[in-house]
Amino acid sequence: MNRNRLTECVLPTVLFVDMNSFFASCEQQVNFWLRGRPVGVCVYTGRQGCVIAPSVEAKLRGVKTGMRLDEAMALCPDLVPVETHPSRYREFHVKIVAVLKKFSDDVVPKSIDEAVVDLTNYQLVYKDMRKVAQDIKQAIRRDVGDYMRCSIGIAPNVFLAKLASDVQKPDGLTVITPDTIDDVLRSLRLTDLPGIGRGMAARLEAGGIHTPLALRYASPDHLKAVCQSIIGWHWHLRLNFSGEVDLDSSGANKSMSAMRTISPEQRSTPERLEELLLSLCLTLERRMVRQQVFCQEMSFSCRYQSGKTYNYEVRFPEPRQDGPELYQIINQRLLTFQEAHRCEPVLNEHLRSMCVAVFRFIPTESVPLSLFSDTSRKDKLRQTLHDLKAKFGSDKLLRATELRDDPVYRDVIGFGNIKDL
């Protein structure tokens, strides 16, 4: 797919497929008794749990993503909490992408529940893009599951196609063309546009741009001045059918992070918190091995129930990929900090969340050999370990450090980028 077209394109040949209430729909697909009922997918189903994905029926009752489970149950007493099954969602994702690739080779998954289908090079094959979208909906219901629904937006570029996919939910189909775009924008707020949050909306309003329609007709120079960056010019291009600019066309990760909100059970003992920290480091190891990269920097941060935070960053003298090594580096830093300042443990019962991030990657083949130690055998063993896990299952071969009678860490999956699924 050409992500950097700068020529004018007004034909609606780009489809943005957005699966409706994806996690909950997967659960309803495999469990007939959940169909038609308000469902809330949660990582933990205790009172302090959080609804990460409400079903269509739950959304109609006012349940929102991120709502605490007890609040959701008070709002919707017949809500059915269901524990998340990440491997199941990955399987459905793979099946959906396989269906989309029957219509075009130019398919780019944008997240676990979204994908772009570019039909620009298929205009001799497909005469009616709306008919193609309807055929995609039918194919997903037939080949993936009869309870799986999606909203599809059709437009000349990805930005507008994504915008169109949000206009009508669930099971919607909206086409944006030069003749219809003003009507679509007229019904929206600035924050309804992809990439515009409250902060950017406030900046635009301060510059006299209060609506998406005003954003479309603002001059590129004014937009660049208001936004204080080139992003204003990009919005002008997209809203005026002048091109598609993807700022991250390389497909490479700039960073990877593993983060968890910590339940009362997880913070009950220091050992449980240390186990969670190790699990986060092992998650990053798996992702780096899969992407065939080593990191040169790492950060660790945690937030407490009081709102206080602790942050730590380190630059490595040699690139790292090994999860237990990352864990040891963080753990040693915490011990040094606690001894130097004679304070309570950083990992304590008041923790609310914990995050480990790695960045500044270099390809595996570019990692320089160490003058003081031969790590090549260890690196090859790590690669072999993850190859076997990928082939036979993540629980079929474990390190001693991964063995737990009652694991505190549960696999989860987000709605964002799918590079590290």
Spell out what each predicted region is.
Residues 22, 45-48, 305-309, 361-364:
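Short, charged/polar surface micro-motifs in flexible loops or helix N-caps
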Residues 150-154, 295-299, 354:
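A short glycine-rich, hydrophobically flanked beta-strand micro-motif that places a catalytic Asp/Glu
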